C-alpha cells in the first residue's frame, strides 16, 4: 500500500450533478495536490479544512475553479493522507482532473480499494467495511438504517463477544492439557452450559439474515390473470402512477410492465403481465409467453380475478399454471356486485378484495404480502443490523463446530477433541470480523464495491 491511489468518488450519471469529487489516498497525496492546485491568496494546506482555488493543467492553465480538502494521516477514512478535489460535476472536468492525477504518479484505484485500505490499516473491521457497501447500495430508508447499524460496529461487537467466550474456554482447556494435575476437576456441565449459551448467541445472529436479505435483494411479484380483470389498474393504484395503459379493451397489455415499489422498506419489483388467454395474434402470443416466464421467476404471484364474474374455469387454468409459486388471490372490482367468489382451498396464501380504480384494498394487499413473508410487523430500529450471506455462512460453520464440541463432551472424549472444534469455531467467527480471513476472501468482498469507495 505504498503507492497513492485516485478515483472519482461521486456517481457518474447521464444527468450530470452540480458537484464531482476526485479522491486521493496515500503518502504522496498532499505533494501531488500542491503541484496541481493553486490556493487563493496566502492560504496554506491545513488538515481538515476546506480551501478554495484553481486546479491546474500541465501547462499551468486553469482546468476548474474548485475546493480542496486535505485530511492528514491518521485522521482520515483510510488512515493515510487523503485529498479530495470538489469540482464542478461535468464529466469532462472530472475526467481531466483524474487524468492529471494519474499523470503525476497516482494509480487508479481498484473497486473498494479505499475501504480495503481502511480495513488493512485498522480503521474499520470487515463487517463495517461490508456495511459501507450496503449503505451505498441501500434501496430504502430501512435498508440504509440496517447498514448504519453494521457500520456502527454493532454486529462486530456481538461477534467479538462470542469469539472471546470461545477463546477463553479454549485457553482453559489447553491449560488443563498442560497442568491437569494442578487444577480441580473439570465441571463438564458448566462447559455444556457455556457452549449452549454460545450456540444460542450464534443462532440469534443468524436469525437476522432473513430480514437483511429481504432489504438487500427485495422481492419480485408478478401480477397475472385473465385479460381485463384490472391487473394494470392494480399496478397503477399500487404505484400511484399511470405506469400501465388501462382501457376497457381486453389484451391492452402486450408486454411485461415493471415498477419498483417500497413495501415497508422492502424493495418490491412488480411485474404487470399480459392477460392470459388463447392468443389472437403473434404479438399477443409472445406477451402471454412472457407472462408465464414472469410468473415462474417471481417470488410471489398475485392472481387477479374479476369480482363481477367470480372464479371462472379460465382462472382455474391459470392457477394450475402458477400454483408452484406462492399465490395470493386478488379479487378486483370488489365494489361491484357479482356471484359468490370461491377460491381454491389449498395453495392460496390469502384472498384480498380490492377496488383498484379508487385504491381500496392496497394496504390489505401489502399486509398479506408481509404475512406471506412471515414479516407481519416489519420495522428497523436504530442500531439494528443483519448478517449478510458471507457472514451467515461463517456463523453456520461456527455453529456446526460448537455442536460438535457438545457432542464430544457428552461422549466423554478426551479434551484434545474439544479444543479442535472450539478452535474451528473461533476461526469461523474471526472470519466474520476479518480477524482470520484469507487474501482471496478479501479480494472477493472488495471487488463488489464501487470504484472510489
Curated annotation (Swiss-Prot):
* Protein's UniProt keywords contain Ribonucleoprotein: no
Sites where the protein binds Mg(2+) = 232, 253
Q: Which residues form the TrmE-type G domain?
A: 218-374
The EC number(s) attached to this protein equal 3.6.-.-
Gene Ontology terms describing biological process:
tRNA methylation; tRNA wobble uridine modification
List ligand-binding residues for GTP: 228-233, 247-253, 272-275
Q: Does the keyword Hydrolase apply?
A: yes
Q: How does it assemble?
A: Homodimer. Heterotetramer of two MnmE and two MnmG subunits.
Per the record, the similarity remark reads: Belongs to the TRAFAC class TrmE-Era-EngA-EngB-Septin-like GTPase superfamily. TrmE GTPase family.
Protein name per its UniProtKB record: tRNA modification GTPase MnmE
- Name the species this protein comes from: Gloeobacter violaceus (strain ATCC 29082 / PCC 7421)
Gene name in the database record: mnmE
Amino acid at each position: 500500500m505504498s503507492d497513492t491511489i485516485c478515483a472519482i468518488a461521486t456517481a457518474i450519471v447521464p444527468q450530470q450533478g452540480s458537484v464531482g469529487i476526485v479522491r486521493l489516498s496515500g503518502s504522496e497525496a498532499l505533494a501531488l495536490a500542491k503541484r496541481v492546485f493553486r490556493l487563493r491568496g496566502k492560504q496554506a494546506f491545513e488538515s481538515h479544512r476546506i480551501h478554495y482555488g484553481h486546479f491546474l493543467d500541465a501547462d499551468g492553465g486553469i482546468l476548474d475553479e474548485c475546493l480542496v480538502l486535505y485530511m492528514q494521516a491518521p485522521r482520515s477514512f483510510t488512515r493515510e493522507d487523503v485529498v479530495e478535489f470538489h469540482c464542478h460535476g461535468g464529466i469532462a472536468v472530472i475526467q481531466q482532473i483524474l487524468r492529471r492525477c494519474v499523470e503525476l504518479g497516482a494509480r487508479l484505484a481498484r473497486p473498494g480499494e479505499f475501504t480495503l485500505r481502511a480495513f488493512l490499516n485498522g480503521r474499520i473491521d470487515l463487517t463495517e467495511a461490508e456495511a459501507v457497501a450496503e449503505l451505498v447500495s441501500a434501496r430504502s430508508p430501512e435498508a440504509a438504517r440496517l447498514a448504519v447499524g453494521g457500520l456502527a460496529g454493532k454486529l462486530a461487537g456481538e461477534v467479538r463477544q462470542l469469539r472471546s467466550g470461545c477463546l477463553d474456554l479454549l485457553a482453559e482447556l489447553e491449560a488443563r492439557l498442560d497442568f491437569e494435575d494442578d487444577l480441580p476437576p473439570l465441571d463438564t456441565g458448566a462447559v455444556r452450559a457455556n457452549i449452549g449459551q454460545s450456540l444460542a448467541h450464534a443462532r440469534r445472529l443468524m436469525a437476522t439474515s432473513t430480514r437483511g436479505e429481504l432489504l438487500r435483494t427485495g422481492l419480485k411479484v408478478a401480477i397475472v390473470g385473465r385479460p381485463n380483470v384490472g391487473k394494470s389498474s392494480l399496478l397503477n393504484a399500487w404505484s400511484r402512477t399511470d405506469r400501465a395503459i388501462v382501457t376497457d379493451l381486453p389484451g391492452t397489455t402486450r408486454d411485461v410492465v415493471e415498477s419498483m415499489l417500497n413495501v415497508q422498506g422492502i424493495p418490491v419489483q412488480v411485474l404487470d403481465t399480459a392477460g392470459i388467454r388463447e392468443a389472437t395474434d403473434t404479438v399477443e402470443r409472445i406477451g402471454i409467453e412472457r407472462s408465464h416466464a414472469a410468473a415462474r421467476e417471481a417470488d410471489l404471484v398475485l392472481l387477479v380475478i374479476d369480482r363481477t364474474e367470480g372464479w371462472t374455469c379460465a382462472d382455474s387454468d391459470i392457477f394450475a399454471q402458477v400454483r408452484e409459486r406462492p399465490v395470493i388471490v386478488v379479487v378486483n372490482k370488489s365494489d361491484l356486485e357479482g356471484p359468490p367468489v370461491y377460491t381454491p382451498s389449498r395453495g392460496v396464501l390469502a384472498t384480498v378484495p380490492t377496488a383498484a380504480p379508487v385504491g381500496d384494498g392496497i394496504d390489505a394487499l401489502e399486509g398479506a404480502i408481509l404475512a406471506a413473508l412471515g414479516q407481519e410487523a416489519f420495522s428497523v430500529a436504530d442500531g439494528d443490523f443483519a448478517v449478510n450471506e458471507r457472514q451467515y455462512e461463517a456463523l453456520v460453520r461456527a455453529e456446526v463446530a460448537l455442536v460438535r464440541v457438545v457432542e464430544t463432551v457428552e461422549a466423554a472424549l478426551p479434551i484434545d477433541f474439544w479444543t479442535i472444534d472450539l478452535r474451528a469455531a473461533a476461526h469461523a467467527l474471526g472470519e466474520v470480523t476479518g480477524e482470520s480471513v484469507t487474501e482471496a476472501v478479501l479480494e472477493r468482498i472488495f471487488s463488489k464495491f464501487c470504484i472510489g469507495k
